[in-house]
Amino acid sequence: MKRSEYLVRRRRARVAVMMLFALIMGFVSAAPPVVTGCQAQDLTPVPDTSVLSPAISVPVQAEPAAPVLPEKWVCLTFDDGPSKTTPDVLNALNAAGVHATFFVVATGHNEKYLPLLTEAVSAGHQIALHSASHEYSDIYRSSEAYWADIALLKERIAPYVDAESIRYLRFPGGSTNTVSRRYGGKGLMKQLKAEVEQKGWQWVDWNVCAEDAVGGHPSADTIYRNVVRETGQQTNCIVLMHDSATTRTTAEALPDIIRWYADQGFAFLTVAEALPIG
């Protein structure tokens, strides 16, 4: 073979090899990259921003803040009304611009005074449950007897207030009374308190007692001094008083009681304001 032919063939072979190499490299560069250690489901797709709507800022709904109570507060509460005493109590409260809480009864003997509940609500006072009969031997026979009494109370006051919305109550004799043991046994009050809480209601005791229903018809001055003495150094007070037919002097003492608490820097709250439910 002549030298010239040899050189031509060698040049052609070199060109073929170069073309093949270029073809291989082009194929490799066009192949998708392989990401070591990731599966397709592990990769986060990149959105096509050209078709996305502008971002919308959605405000975060904050939990409602719990009400902040004054450092010193007092709840004036009245049991066993309404009665002929209630108008005088309402007059004293309204004159002072003070709201109170009434734990009411509906015994069948005070029916003509029940319309006063509407007046009390209109003036901004709170109505709460006490008892229909206030007969310990009846209401504390059993849990069923107690709740039957409450149902009767709600039925009797329903024409005058929104009875179904009431979620506060006071046990006759208080939550730690021992008289209930005679009729329903030692564990009855514990059971009743648990049942009240299961309903999402609130039972309410007191830490200041006016001692206006202990018998002997205490004078207005005695009732006033009882309240001042029992308040002592306490800064959060729930005062037990009565607006029953036999506690007329409570209404007489009320202006001085209100004035004394105001002078001591107490804010006047209803029970619902001081002990909010949920």
Model-derived features: where do they sit?
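Active-site beta->alpha N-cap acidic-glycine motif
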Residues: 47-171, 274-277
